[in-house]
C-alpha cells in the first residue's frame, strides 16, 4: 500500500486500503473496503464498511453510512444513520435511523431519530425533529419540528415549521405551515398558507 496518514483500529478496519490517504477507521470493518478513498472518518462497527473510492465522509455509529461505495461529502452520526446510502453525496443524517433509506439522493438533511426514514432517491429535503418527514418520497420539502410533514409522500416544495405542522399532508405541494399543528389536518390541499 502507498496510502499515507491513515489510522485503523479494529478487525478489518481499512483492510483493503491501497492508495487512499488521511482516513481514520475505528471499529470492526470500519472503512474495510476503502481502496483509494481519502479524508474519511469512520467510528463504529461497519461504519463506512463498503466505501471504496468515496472521499470526505464522516460516519459515527454502528452501521452509519454502511452501504456507501463512491459517495462523497456525507455526514452520518447515530446507529444506522444514512445506512443505505450508496452514491448520494452531500447528505447529513444525525440520529438513530436518520435518513437510513437514502440510497442515491443528494443534499438531504435529516436531524432527529427516524427523520427522512422513507426517503430513497430524493434530494433537497430538510427534516429536523423526531420522525419529521418520515414517510417522504419527494424532493425539496422542509420540516422543522417533531412529526412535521410526517405523512408526506409525494408532495413537493412544502414548508412546515412547528411540531405536528402539516403532519397529515400526503400528496399536496407548495404549502406553508408555521406554528404548532398548523395545517395539521390538510391531506391533499395545495398552495395553502397558515401562520
Where do the PLM segments sit?
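Glycine- and small/polar-enriched repetitive beta-structure motifs of secreted/surface proteins
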Residues: 1-195
